[in-house]
């Protein structure tokens, strides 16, 4: 089984416990699961290996993105919407947006939202190096004159989401509020993998408008970028 699936199970249980919830009891059965996942190193090493003896009964389900999300609902007995999201670097944020929409539309009362990324083989490193996307000296200098590429990273994170009204009614500890989310796409840019500044500005304006917040009120910004002159 893809270690990313193992990690999601472990971190999801940690998130549920940290939220003071118990699967099968206080964790609602209609809880949705939304997982951002876009790296398939383990799948490539198992299913696409020339050694077919490495493929077993559960290799397929152990490698599928859909199973990374589905396994959580299976083990936790959850019957809300379930989806794995692959939008490359934005996968977990788009999963978060989808979860917020599902809660707002009454599709689930609670949502597990997560993202996972493990780097298990050299193949994508070679690909991104050929593309010129990786920093040759292993340092990401986003927004700096000397920016020469980004650095890949690993990790896993899971959040437990509810509407504010539901969380307050349940007496939950609220760590943060999501004022609004927004999603769009670059459309046409200089090339397929290059960002479109105008489109990115528009999605931020949309999120601010939905939240009823002005740009001047924002005190902290966390961004994702290419770490290059783009």
Task: For the regions a language model picked out, list residue spans one by one.
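Condensing-enzyme catalytic core of the thiolase-fold
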Residues: 1-230
């Amino acid at each position: 089984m893809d270690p990313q699936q193992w990690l999601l199970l472990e971190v999801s249980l940690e998130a549920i416990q940290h939220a003071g919830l118990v699967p099968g009891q206080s964790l609602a059965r209609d809880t949705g699961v939304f997982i951002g996942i876009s790296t398939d190193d383990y799948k490539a090493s198992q299913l696409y290996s020339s050694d077919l003896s490495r493929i077993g009964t559960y290799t397929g389900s152990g490698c599928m993105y859909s199973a990374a999300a589905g396994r959580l609902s299976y083990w936790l007995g959850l019957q809300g919407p379930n989806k794995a999201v692959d939008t490359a670097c934005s996968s977990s944020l788009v999963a978060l947006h989808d979860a917020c929409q599902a809660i707002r539309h009454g599709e689930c009362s609670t949502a597990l939202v997560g993202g996972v990324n493990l780097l298990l083989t050299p193949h994508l490193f070679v690909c991104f190096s050929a593309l010129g996307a990786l920093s040759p000296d292993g340092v990401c200098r986003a927004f700096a004159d000397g920016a020469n590429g980004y650095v890949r990273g690993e990790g896993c994170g899971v959040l437990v989401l509810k509407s504010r009204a539901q969380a307050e009614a349940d007496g939950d500890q609220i760590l943060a509020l999501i004022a609004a989310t927004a999603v769009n796409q670059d459309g046409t840019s200089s090339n397929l993998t290059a960002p479109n500044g105008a489109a990115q500005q528009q999605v931020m304006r949309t999120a601010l408008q939905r939240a009823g917040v002005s740009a001047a009120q924002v005190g902290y910004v966390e961004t994702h970028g290419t770490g290059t002159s783009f």
